[in-house]
């Protein structure tokens, strides 16, 4: 039976793509698909987040992008300014369900945070997750300020009846400061869900083979890895 997992985060530029790639790489014995509902800020032909996941994770990954908008804005704004049709949650759900018929694991990577709008009616990634009845993995920064943002994201999930599968730190410094070290213990409390990994800062710059080889060390057993809090 296929698994669909939605990957969201507390904001933008926090490591959602590298975390998605790590989860895909850790599932190396599975047929994995990565679905990017809305890619913004790239011109046609430029490699997007889904393609980057496939580059990092390996050849067992199928990369799919539903829509692309040229300006680096929220999907609803980018679609409106480009005069293009926005992405709708039902389209995301249908695409994920179709991929699930041919893959063991489908990862749906959102844009920005959980409640970034897909369209001018206010639809979000959370609506797609609800249509799919899929759990949500939250990617969070390591440092100061992450506890509040993580708690707000988890609260938004709970208020919509969605399952927060856990939290993964998207970019863990090689020499973490005091806040980052303390947050290893405090993030699960803020989220009401387990901390399931910490991807090292700069991992996305690794060659694909090195990234894929290291991914299991960065993720907890629940995500196919061997990571445990306190281990880097």
Task: Please provide the spans of the model-predicted regions.
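Short, structured coil segments at secondary-structure junctions
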Residues: 57, 132, 190-193
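N-terminal phosphate/diphosphate-binding loop that engages ATP/GTP or pyrophosphate donors
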Residues: 18-86, 90, 95-98
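Switch II (G3) loop of P-loop NTPases
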Residues: 92-121
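Inter-motif core of Ras-like GTPase G domains
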Residues: 119-142
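Charged helix-capping and loop-helix junction motifs
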Residues: 120-127, 151-154, 180-185
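Glycine-rich phosphate-binding P-loop
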Residues: 6-21
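C-terminal lobe/tail of nucleotide-utilizing enzymes
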Residues: 155-232
